[in-house]
Amino acid sequence: MAKKVVATIELMLPAQQASPAPPVGPALGQHGVNIMEFVKQFNAASRDYEPGTILPVVITVYQDRSFTFIMKTPPVSYLLKKAAGVEKGSSDPKRVKVGKITVKQLEEIAKMKMKDMNTRDLKAAMRTVAGTAKSMGIEIEGWKE
């Protein structure tokens, strides 16, 4: 028989830098999960990413206090800010542009995010990422909408 799911917890954690401090400790502690075990497993699983990269993680807690977790790819906004070399998006994206990326960078980000998106079409994924870039005030050189 399958284990009974008690809770599903969604967190955004820095790769290789998870610690028992908030938000991890309180979120897992209230469900009786071994926090240090999660921290060790998450930090080991996030070795492929640059330290500090923000990763969404979905933790499923079972009745016997065991857990499983799924790491997703970094958010599109994080990847766009990194590619454009900006600290944050524009407060007025229609008038104030904060950075530029190339179509090649757009394609790389779309390919990276494909497994988390609900499309298998690269062009559709690129349009989705381009929409996020537009709402952040990041221009895409050579992109025709």
Curated annotation (Swiss-Prot):
Xref: PROSITE patterns: RIBOSOMAL_L11 (PS00359)
Keyword rRNA-binding: yes
UniProt keyword list: Methylation, Ribonucleoprotein, Ribosomal protein, RNA-binding, rRNA-binding
Gene Ontology BP annotations: translation
Highest taxon listed in the record's lineage: Bacteria
SMART domains: RL11 (SM00649)
UniProt key word RNA-binding: yes
Modifications made to the protein after synthesis: One or more lysine residues are methylated.
GO terms of molecular function: large ribosomal subunit rRNA binding; structural constituent of ribosome
Pfam families cross-referenced by the UniProt entry: Ribosomal_L11, Ribosomal_L11_N
Cross-referenced InterPro entries: Ribosomal_uL11 (IPR000911), Ribosomal_uL11_bac-typ (IPR006519), Ribosomal_uL11_C (IPR020783), Ribosomal_uL11_C_sf (IPR036769), Ribosomal_uL11_CS (IPR020785), Ribosomal_uL11_N (IPR020784), Ribosomal_uL11_N_sf (IPR036796)
Function as written in the Swiss-Prot or TrEMBL entry: Forms part of the ribosomal stalk which helps the ribosome interact with GTP-bound translation factors.
Quaternary structure and interacting proteins, as annotated: Part of the ribosomal stalk of the 50S ribosomal subunit. Interacts with L10 and the large rRNA to form the base of the stalk. L10 forms an elongated spine to which L12 dimers bind in a sequential fashion forming a multimeric L10(L12)X complex.
Name of the protein in its database record: Large ribosomal subunit protein uL11
Annotated organism of origin: Aquifex aeolicus (strain VF5)
Gene: rplK
